């Protein structure tokens, strides 16, 4: 964050300085003097620096003065001295309003200059002026030293200003390009991240909604199916019981005495209460199944709310981080403005003495340092973005694992429901078998009572048991014992058939 703030601070400083201070200087010196063969100064520079105004004397000393200041009067050849003295004389003639000026002296040509000297010799006034200027060349050199140095300093200042302005524009352009590219990349990343979040959220919501609807439909269908089966079975059983009960009531009157013992044995074994207990257990199991389905529905709803809460918390945290970054950027801008005021005062106080020796190398080093820090910041941001992506993918993987666990639990519940349904059907088949067996026994008893041969056999057996002979010492088994054995065998058979259901 500090490196980012430093980059923004530098960008604002460069932009402000290059656009305000250097802009003012460039606006004032935009029309600065272009030193060519015909040195012409603009109105702004002439008003700010009067010594830059183009004059006849200045034009006359244009070639002589730089050589004299740099190497001394002895290094200047005679032709240049003569030409300079002639031009100075012409300037005096023009300044004094002299009407007659030698025509050959108005042409910048070496041959014309020799003709000009011959014409100057023809007049004592002309020659005296020329001779005086030629003798004063050494003093003229030193008299114009300070204006010449001022002009050279101004040239240096303008050149440095132009260099600094060009450098500032280049840095500003580069930083603007980098900032634009960074903003574009950041915006693209945020757009991709937001789009990814929306896709994940939509997929998760769609999957949650589809799974919830499927689960509710399956549970509702199974519950309705079980209720329908139980209702239909109970109705059929009730109707059949009523019908058979009416038939039995009509037929039991005829065989009441014969079946009384069998009824007593059945009452002792309490089969009816066992059937009712099994029925109550089945209903309790179905009730537990309904409650378990409701618990699964509530658990799935809580998981859905938890996922939505996690996504909302993550979105709020991301918004808070972006708000913090915006606040830091605002604070950086305020600090940049405060530092810029001090920077401007330092710039005005130490521009000329430190521009050549300090600022240009420091700006070059600063540019290199800035590029290095920018590269490091870019790599750091890439690492942070990669870390954020890993955390996001890890969070969604955890959510997927939780959903898979919920699916496994639902599969387990479905298996248990299938097992309960299977046991209920087995119990129904056992009850049906018991009903058919009872029906068959009653029918057999009814047919036996109506059959005359059965009564004949019973009479023979009774007479035989009452009047048995002494030769045959056989102990007859009473009929009651037969009934008891039959009831015992029936109980054993029914226990074998219903044992697995009772164990469950």
Curated annotation (Swiss-Prot):
Keywords: Endoplasmic reticulum, Glycoprotein, Karyogamy, Membrane, Nucleus, Signal, Transmembrane, Transmembrane helix
Cytoplasmic domain ranges by topology: 471-481
Induction: By mating pheromone. Expression is directly controlled by STE12 as cells respond to mating pheromone.
Localization of this protein: Endoplasmic reticulum membrane; Nucleus membrane
Lumenal side: 20-452, 503-504
Transmembrane region(s): 453-470, 482-502
Any one annotated GO CC term: nuclear membrane
BP term (GO), one: nuclear membrane fusion involved in karyogamy
Record membrane topology: Multi-pass membrane protein
Main location: endoplasmic reticulum
Glycosylated residues in this chain: 159, 206, 313, 404
Signal peptide: 1-19
Function comment: Required for nuclear membrane fusion during karyogamy.
UniProt family annotation: Belongs to the KAR5 family.
Name of the featured protein: Nuclear fusion protein KAR5
Originating organism: Saccharomyces cerevisiae (strain YJM789)
């Amino acid at each position: 964050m500090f490196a980012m703030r430093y980059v923004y601070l530098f960008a604002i400083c460069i932009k402000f300085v290059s656009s305000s201070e250097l802009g003012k200087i460039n606006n004032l010196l935009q029309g600065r003097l272009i030193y060519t063969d015909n040195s012409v100064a603009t109105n702004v520079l002439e008003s700010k620096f009067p010594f830059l105004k183009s004059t006849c004397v200045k034009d006359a000393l244009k070639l002589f003065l730089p050589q004299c200041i740099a190497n001394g009067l002895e290094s200047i050849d005679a032709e240049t001295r003569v030409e300079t003295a002639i031009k100075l004389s012409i300037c005096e003639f023009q300044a004094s309003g002299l009407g007659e000026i030698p025509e050959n002296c108005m042409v910048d040509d070496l041959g014309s200059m020799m003709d000009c000297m011959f014409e100057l010799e023809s007049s004592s006034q002309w020659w005296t002026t020329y001779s005086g200027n030629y003798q004063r060349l050494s003093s003229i050199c030193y008299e114009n030293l300070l204006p010449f140095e001022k002009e050279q300093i101004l040239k240096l200042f303008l050149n440095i200003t132009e260099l600094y302005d060009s450098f500032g524009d280049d840095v500003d352009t580069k930083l603007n390009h980098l900032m634009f590219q960074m903003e574009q990349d950041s915006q693209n990343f945020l757009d991709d991240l937001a789009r990814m979040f929306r896709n994940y959220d939509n997929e998760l919501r769609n999957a949650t909604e589809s799974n919830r609807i499927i689960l509710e439909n399956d549970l509702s269908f199974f519950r309705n199916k079980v209720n329908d089966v139980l209702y239909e079975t109970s109705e059929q059983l009730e109707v059949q019981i009523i019908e058979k009960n009416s038939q039995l009531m009509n037929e039991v009157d005829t065989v009441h005495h014969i079946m009384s013992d069998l009824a007593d044995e059945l009452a002792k074994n309490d089969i009816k209460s066992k059937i009712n207990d099994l029925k109550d257990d089945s209903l309790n199991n179905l009730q537990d199944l309904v409650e378990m389905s409701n618990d699964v529905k509530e658990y799935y709803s809580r998981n859905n709310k938890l996922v939505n809460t996690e996504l909302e918390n993550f979105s709020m945290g991301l918004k808070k981080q972006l708000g913090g970054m915006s606040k830091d950027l605002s604070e950086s801008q305020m600090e940049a403005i405060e530092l810029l005021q001090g920077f401007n005062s330092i710039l005005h106080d130490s521009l000329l003495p430190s521009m050549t020796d300090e600022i240009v190398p420091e700006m070059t080093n600063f540019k290199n340092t800035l590029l290095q820090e920018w590269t490091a910041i870019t790599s750091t941001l890439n690492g942070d973005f990669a870390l954020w992506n890993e955390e996001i993918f890890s969070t969604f993987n955890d959510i997927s694992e939780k959903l898979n666990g919920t699916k496994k639990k639902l599969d387990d519940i479905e298996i248990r429901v299938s097992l309960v349904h299977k046991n209920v059907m087995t119990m129904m088949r056992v009850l049906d078998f018991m009903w058919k067996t009872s029906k068959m026994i009653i029918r057999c008893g009814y047919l036996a009572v109506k059959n005359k041969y059965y009564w004949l056999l019973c009479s023979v057996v009774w007479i035989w048991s009452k009047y048995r002979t002494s030769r045959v010492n056989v102990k007859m088994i009473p009929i009651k014992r037969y009934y008891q054995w039959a009831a015992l065998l029936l109980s054993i058979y029914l226990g074998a058939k219903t044992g697995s259901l009772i164990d469950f």
